[in-house]
A protein has these predicted regions:
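Cleavable N-terminal signal peptides
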Residues: 10-11, 21
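N-terminal edge beta-strand
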Residues: 23-41
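Bacterial N-terminal signal peptides that target proteins for export
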Residues: 1-9
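A glycine-anchored, Pro-Gly-centered beta-turn/N-cap motif
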Residues: 93-102
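Short, surface-exposed alpha-helix to beta-strand junction/turn motifs within ectodomains of secreted
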Residues: 46, 51-73
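Extended, polar beta-sheet/loop recognition surfaces of beta-rich domains
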Residues: 40, 44-51, 108-121
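Short strand-edge motifs at loop-to-beta-strand transitions and within beta-strands
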Residues: 83-87
Length: 121
């Protein structure tokens, strides 16, 4: 009985303590906010994720309504914040913009997604 109880406790501990290792990184927040309308031209798009990211394998692409790329292509992690990804924007005018991301979290899982925001000064 004692051996079965110990095995059950070991199994339970393994499940509980390894749960973090299987957590994928999901978008937790963004600026501009998904679906929002902003009145001032943002200098950059900032994305906040639930898990640490691998910068070398994480990308952000921002396009206008015609599909033209309007980011500077320099997505990088925020200094001291391994869950925050930033990409500077070119000078943009009024319209709808699409933000697409593809990130690799430290658990080695790739997650991607997109959202839009509108600029209406």
């Amino acid at each position: 009985m004692r051996g079965a109880r110990g095995a059950a406790l070991a199994l339970l501990a393994g499940i509980v303590f390894s749960a973090g290792a299987f957590a994928h990184s999901f978008l937790e927040g963004a600026e501009p906010r998904p679906g929002s309308t902003v009145k001032t031209v943002p200098a950059e798009v900032r994305l906040r994720f639930t898990e640490r990211l691998e910068a070398a394998f994480s990308t952000v692409l921002v396009t206008d309504e015609s599909g033209k790329r309007v980011d500077r292509g320099e997505a990088h992690l925020e200094a001291g914040a391994p869950k925050r990804l930033r990409v500077p924007l070119l000078s943009v005018g009024p319209g709808r913009y699409t933000v697409k991301w593809r990130v690799l979290s430290v658990d080695s899982h790739v997650v991607e997604g997109e959202f839009t925001f509108r600029l209406a000064p």
